[in-house]
Amino acid sequence: FTGILGQVITHEEGHRSVLTELGIGSVSKPFFDKNLVAKVTGVTDETLINLRNTDFPNFIRLHTAGLESDYAYLKKEDHLFNFNEEDYGTIYADYFARKLGSQFYYLTLLFKTKVDIKEQDDKELDRDIVGHDIYGMIRHLHRPEMEFYRYTNYNQLTYEEQKYAKKIGYLSLFNFLNPNIWRGKKVQLSENTLATPSISFSLAPFGYFIEENMSLLINNK
């Protein structure tokens, strides 16, 4: 349950938390609607435009926070695995489902994915705050002063923006190098020391980052 439906809840709460921190009210709807998307609603265009014009980093984070939330949750589960605080039999199903769910979002960037949702089909307060998280982030990073709209499709990106999207999609494949996905064994460095190396990729308000980690388990601690 937590791996499939739970990720939708925590992902959308990641988006909403940015608004909550800024004192902006919103409504999380973490259940799939008629367009098969979960969303955060209850925010006017005027509020979002003002956020873009006065607090651009947080406006971009509004797009990335869902995937950042997925990343933070999975990093915590990596910690539990790496330091033997949980075994694969307990939370692996949750971990694997969440990993694939977030990775699927990144892999949509490798194809000409169309978000067939028109803003005018919903009332303003019923619209998702950002639409496609990554397309919206990319468009606003490259063209922060262009006409405001929420739902960004692949064909609305410039050639350079499309290249940037594909770059993110390819770089996200680093996430498959995490040995916990494959239930890999730790590396024996000495009689009392085990290591778990990993590489992770995620979005951030400035674009993206790649993180290298080495977890050391010494005397089983």
Predicted regions and their residues:
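Hydrophobic alpha-helical membrane segments
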Residues: 1-221
